[in-house]
């Protein structure tokens, strides 16, 4: 149950300002680490600002959702929601300058398949990236290297409560206890659209799954010109608790505002920021512990040396071919 979950205790926050502080702190910690390494100066223009990191996170989160939407075999919505939540949680406390979101997003999807028991083999998973066996092998190698890091950074809190189950529950409840609405299924399509849009915002980190699901249904009803206040007051028994009803309505309004004010990253801005990001991950600046460790094994002859062609980094272009 959500109310007894690690999600409620550790991953549901009080405000957007709190989320912004956590992200700014992750940005600051990386800057301090890079400066302490003697590789850059404190005000080096190579660094990304917190709002620039957020733009890149938005971009790669959208890429994650696109990847999941065309995945073969079809990926259940619960798996997609779990992967999305992992990605959001990871970059609350980590910087894209240290851990590249391109591989983190795939690792989130890979781990979500396991946790939600979506039976996909490793070759099947990377087979969704591109046809080149070398590209698939390289991607899988990186995913497996980052999987434990991801689990650790999630504090081993791997169970995610998504809004999809309560959403179906509310539809069943409407069919059973709210005869005023003859066909609740007419709300599904627009409500699904709302859930897809709100998944791109921080709502999953701020509100409960049932609040998100109920807001999706009521927003759909509102767009269809259907008034459902009596459902809240009668069926959900909020008539006698006006304070609770008022709070719920305020929460719903806040969620709708999140969706309205969401701005997708502009392609020209993303292109510039990706260049800065690649500079952060270049050999002379990269502080990625996993990369260093792998290089150390190679130096100690634990890992066979690879040809220059095999060492080429897996890139965004490899993902484009799968979409």
UniProtKB/Swiss-Prot annotation:
Compartments where located: Nucleus
InterPro entries associated with the record: Cyclin-like_dom (IPR013763), Cyclin-like_sf (IPR036915), Cyclin/Ssn8 (IPR043198), Cyclin_C_2 (IPR031658), Cyclin_N (IPR006671), CyclinH/Ccl1 (IPR027081)
Keywords, sorted A to Z: Cell cycle, Cyclin, Nucleus, Phosphoprotein, Transcription, Transcription regulation
Gene3D superfamilies in the cross-refs: Cyclin-like
Domain of life: Eukaryota
Compositional bias (Acidic residues): 312-323
PANTHER family, per database record: CYCLIN
Subunit (UniProt): Associates primarily with CDK7 and MAT1 to form the CAK complex. CAK can further associate with the core-TFIIH to form the TFIIH basal transcription factor.
Name under which the protein is recorded: Cyclin-H
